[in-house]
Amino acid sequence: MTTMSDLSPDLVGEILTRVPMTSLISVRCTCKMWNALSKEGIFFKAARKQFMGFTMMDSRVCSMKFDLQGIRNNEHDFVDPCIKQIAKLDQIEVSKVLQCDGLLLCVGKDNSRLLVWNPYLGQTRFIKPRKRFNKLEWYALGYDNNHNYKILMNYDTGHLFGYEIYDFSSDSWRVLDVSPDCHIPFHQQSVSLNGNTYFLAQEKIIVEGEEEEVVDEIEKFLLCFDFTTERFGPRLPLPFHSDVLETVAISCVRDDQLAVLYQRFETWEIWVTTKIDPTAVSWSMFLSVDMEPPTGCQFDDEAGSFFIDEENKVAVFFNSDLFNPRVENRNRRYPTAYIIGQDGYFKSATLREAPDLVKPDPYVYCCPLVWSSYAPSLVQL
């Protein structure tokens, strides 16, 4: 009689690609061989075959899994309809979720506390900010060359502006004396790569005799915060020129590359980095599509998100649409997934119906994907 211990490593790896990532910790306990294979990285290789992400709905964190096999078949539904709320995180209402190498940083809705979660190990850690400011705070999660994790916080009350950093090893906050010569909007997305965080930033204009003024029409660029030096790097150029009417957003590719989206009307471009570090970047075109006839799809660079599938040469976008043609209620927002391919391939699917809103709010019921191709982390919290 064949037992689980008799299965080959290759077959085990295939089995693991079909296991929900949040259940892998239970699978590790199945037998000694599977536990040993996890330590050798088999779990991590299998994990990268999945397109799994975490999303936020109604201030709760949910896991999402996507099957992109056979997407060119019109009968194939590319989105797994199962979206599972993470019961372990029900203890906190979340306003934003960030990730770094398999760890999630959940920002409390009232900014009074932070929660770090390792989905693979099932461990959590609450962190209380040193001070409570307002909703214009933003956070970033990363680590230094010694793999010591840290959290960067920026606050801007209109009267007070500054940075603080939390060190996991000392369990303490301290003021950070940095001041980048540019503006990082609090609503902009950030991406963690190799322990550092990359932001979309824009120039900050100082008008004589008046307070600082930000001019929205100027170019955007990348800015990296290095968690080893605890300093911002130089401005890193994007592979295109953009203005205020055009959409720019960033995402990660397998946690070792960065992807940038550029949308101008019905033209969509996605570029990926061929080299990136805190001081230099180079780019290569991944996808360029002119959507004819027009689809009417406008990516929300504040609430939307995306990831790319290199094997199928497609990009999957997640948006929170105010209008759904099947239900003409403009007081609702509908989390929607779009898939776009090189040859004009286009599909869309509403992930769920949002509750009524008293007043339409572009920041409510948004559905930002945190990351895909999730790789588990063995970092202890």
Swiss-Prot record:
<dbReference type="InterPro" id="IPR017451">
    <property type="entry name" value="F-box-assoc_interact_dom"/>
</dbReference>
<protein>
    <recommendedName>
        <fullName>Putative F-box protein At4g17200</fullName>
    </recommendedName>
</protein>
<feature type="domain" description="F-box">
    <location>
        <begin position="1"/>
        <end position="47"/>
    </location>
</feature>
<dbReference type="Pfam" id="PF00646">
    <property type="entry name" value="F-box"/>
</dbReference>
<dbReference type="InterPro" id="IPR006527">
    <property type="entry name" value="F-box-assoc_dom_typ1"/>
</dbReference>
<dbReference type="Pfam" id="PF07734">
    <property type="entry name" value="FBA_1"/>
</dbReference>
<dbReference type="InterPro" id="IPR001810">
    <property type="entry name" value="F-box_dom"/>
</dbReference>
<dbReference type="InterPro" id="IPR036047">
    <property type="entry name" value="F-box-like_dom_sf"/>
</dbReference>
<dbReference type="InterPro" id="IPR011043">
    <property type="entry name" value="Gal_Oxase/kelch_b-propeller"/>
</dbReference>
<dbReference type="InterPro" id="IPR050796">
    <property type="entry name" value="SCF_F-box_component"/>
</dbReference>
